[in-house]
Every structure is written in C-alpha cells, then in structure tokens.
C-alpha cells in the first residue's frame, strides 16, 4: 500500500437520484474523518443530480460520466482515488452517524473486506423491514469460502454495506458481463485473499423505493436469463482471479446451485409454461446439498407450489418471491413464529441492479 495514501476512499455513484444524493453525501461528510476522501460520480443523470453534487464544492470530488453503468462509473472514480480501502455508497443509501468510527479499527492490511448490517428504509427514510443481513461476527473467511463452494455465495450485505481493500477493485476491472453491480465477483474474491470482518450492527441505511422496488414486479425472461448468466459468469471470473493469484487451486464450483435452480423454475413460469419435473427435482436436490432447517423447507414449499399451481397463480407467486418488501414481510412473520433463534439469510440477490 502507498504510505502517502489516505485510509479510505468513498465513491458515490449517482444516476437520477437528485432526491437522495445529498443525504448520501451529507452522511459521509458528517463522519468528521480527516483520512477520508469523497468522490461522487454522476453517470449521465437527466435530472438535477449534478447540481446537487456540485453544490458541495471542494468538500468532495465531483465527476461526470456518460451513462455507462455504475460499474464503469465507480471504476472511473476509483482510478483517481488514493485510499487503502474503498467504500462504494449507492446515492440513494446513507451511512449511519458514527459508522466510520466503528469501521476504522478494522481497516488493517490483513483485512480484505469489512461488512456490516443495513437498515432497509422507504423513500421517506422510514424502516420497512428488519435489518439485513443477520451477520455473525465470529464467522471466518474459511467458512465463507466453504459457503461459496457449497452454494455459490456467502451471506453478505448489498453494495452499501461493504468496505473493500483497494487491491480487490484493482484486480477485477470492468467485467464484460457486469454493468450495474459492483458487489459481485469483488465480494466473492474477498475471503480468499484476506480476513473478512463482519460487524453485527446497523451502520447504514439501504433504500427500497418505487425506483427499485417496481423492478422486482416487472419480471421478464430476458431479465432472469441475465441474472442466471451473471451468477455463472461471476464464479467463472472468480476462478480466473484465483488462478492468476495462485490461490485455492483445489477449489471448484458447481454448475447446478440452488440459486440458479430456483431462477430456472421462475423463468419457465414467466415464459408461459409450468416447470418440468426434472427442473423441480434438480432444484430440490440442490437445496438438500446446500441448506437445512426452516429456510430449506420454505424454499421447498415455494418450489412445489410453483410446479403445481396454475400459471396465473404461479406468476403471482414469482412476483411475491422477488419483491423485497413482500419477502421482508414474510421473513417478519417467520421470525415471529420461529422458536429456533437461528440467523436468517437469503439466497436471492436483493440488490438494486
């Protein structure tokens, strides 16, 4: 690491979030940290976002790019940063007061990522569901690697809940399969090359509002295909990164994880047909390998219903499954009924991409 660099670079990518970008910037500037630099990238907004951003003057570095997607926007800003660690904060999210004071002690050379819990909020800033995800601070990087091998991912928050060591972004570049998400292969790589620290406290706010919630209800075959392909491409990219570093040579990844198996069932329904018995069996077999307890039983139930229900009802079930607010309400009910006290997590990517 460059001994003359600052400790942390914050990058805030923005596209048409004039109503929220000021809150995001304010939440970082309010941390009162001298070793933090702030970059805000307007990715070709057509609203007043740029005016909101430039109003902060020299307290931030404002960058304007041509609507190339948040990945390219973030990496454009990254090239101008000097931080030993990088934090990407979505423009409609915000940090909690005092968050950086709790994160800073963990920003050590051997740490590849610090992750923390987020409180989902609506457009007015009101909580809409329980904090997510339920992180376990005792969980080790090796356990996270085991999770990736077993199910293709590990429990991690959306973009705004992660601070990554600089070399993670230096090594990944702009994947040709990824345009909108910066929390993909980067976060998969983290446990393989360092210690991942999990803070089981809410240190940020993750906004779910009409601009991103509605996307979950507008499901299409094309969108599901993109998600399925992106999941597979991330793992293939991860394998390339590990090989280039000479890391985890004996680790291999499957092609039939439960995450994509469930999406295959949904894709069939969206395409206008019921899932086949083989598609159902493949998904249920993956669940048996990867999960246990109440979470597995609920996903088994969802799968059987998607297979057995008439198409109109099955389509409604798919929309319910993919909607973050509906899923949050279901999780609240489950939590109230459960006496096991287990930590909850999801296999669905609930990001905004």
Please give the residue ranges for each predicted region:
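C-terminal subregions of glycosyltransferases and related glycan-biosynthesis enzymes
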Residues: 150-152, 180, 205-353
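Short aromatic/hydrophobic "clamp" motif used to bind/position activated sugar donors
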Residues: 86
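A conserved acidic beta->alpha catalytic loop
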Residues: 27, 34, 42-51, 67, ...
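A conserved hydrophobic helix/loop-capping motif in glycosyltransferases and polysaccharide synthases
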Residues: 8-20, 24, 31-32, 41
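Acidic donor-binding/catalytic loop of UDP-sugar-dependent glycosyltransferases
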Residues: 48, 93-105
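Glycine-rich, basic loop-to-helix element that forms the pyrophosphate-binding segment
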Residues: 65-81
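Conserved nucleotide-sugar donor-binding catalytic segment
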Residues: 79, 141-219
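Flexible acidic/His/Gly-enriched loops in nucleotide-sugar-dependent glycosyltransferase catalytic domains
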Residues: 70-73, 100-168
